[in-house]
Amino acid sequence: MLKGKYRRSLKCDDIVFTRKLFQQHYCLQMLQQKSYRQLLTLLCFSLVLMSLSSLFIGRYSLSVQDVVYILLGAPHSEHSREKAAVIFDLRLPRIIAAGMVGAGLSVAGATYQAVLKNALASPDVLGTSSASAFGAALGIVMGLSYQVSTGCAFVFGMLSLALVFGLCFLRQSQEAIVTILSGLIVASVFVAFVSVLKYLADPEDTLPAIVFWLMGSFSSLVKTEVFSLIPLFMFCYYVIYRLRWTMNILSLGDDEAKIQGLHPLLLKIILPVSASVMISASVVLCGGVGWVGLVIPHLVRALVGNNHGKLIPVTALCGALFLLVIDTLARALTYAEIPVGILSALTGAPLFAFLYVRGANHDHR
């Protein structure tokens, strides 16, 4: 009789403990979801504020009254038309381009890291950046127009991805290490081709243009090209965003993905292709910009963890904000504009070192 009562009391205690544990887990999830929403709100507000601030900054001074008047109403005087041209033809396309490129490179880096299961994967790992740079340099050396040169950059960026997949097919393997090694081979070849073009280029005219392109800059943007690439960026981001949950399963291995009913080979084609298209389009807009696709995903992981459902949206916002700040500093620090690639490297490398040391200290605890 006593044993029966004792067993019933144990069952009641187990039920109470399980209920409390469930309540604690539910409260923790609610707190995490609330903090995640607050982070998204903060990033969106910061991005909008930085975009508006960038409209005032530049060699041509604009007051708050000028910007508000031009954005809300139609300019009438000749002087106000000049200011409107500065905003709508120069600064606004540049702000949009910096945001798109920052978000695109960051999301592409996070996608590569998930698919290749390598934390050091970046937009350079599959040779897309190097191939796009070669395409642009080839157009410059051949004296082609700006539009044709950027088209060459995009075509060669896609060609590099086809070569990587071709090497993986010849190797008859879709393992991450094989893909990375194939990308390194393709990247090395296109880096060598760029060096050949720099060697053959005219040192008085063509060579400086190639070097300036490789350093990265938004100074030579074409407004129509910026707006024409917006749908491409949005489509690629939409594909990755819709498949963001599958990256969590892919990181566990192909066998786990098959158990969950996924097609790992198809995902390993769709996700890298979408990321590579954004990388090529980014190189088309501003040339070579490093560290963004490597540093920003690591920074966001320190904030929201490894869940790609939260990682991808926050990475896009952080990348856009980061490169927008870098571009604003590039045209505000000195009278002569500093290439964006230089400032992104000077900022990204110390930031990555900080995250690296912080992670090492956390592992030792």
Regions found by a protein language model. Give the residues of each.
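Alpha-helical transmembrane segments in inner-membrane proteins
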Residues: 4-365
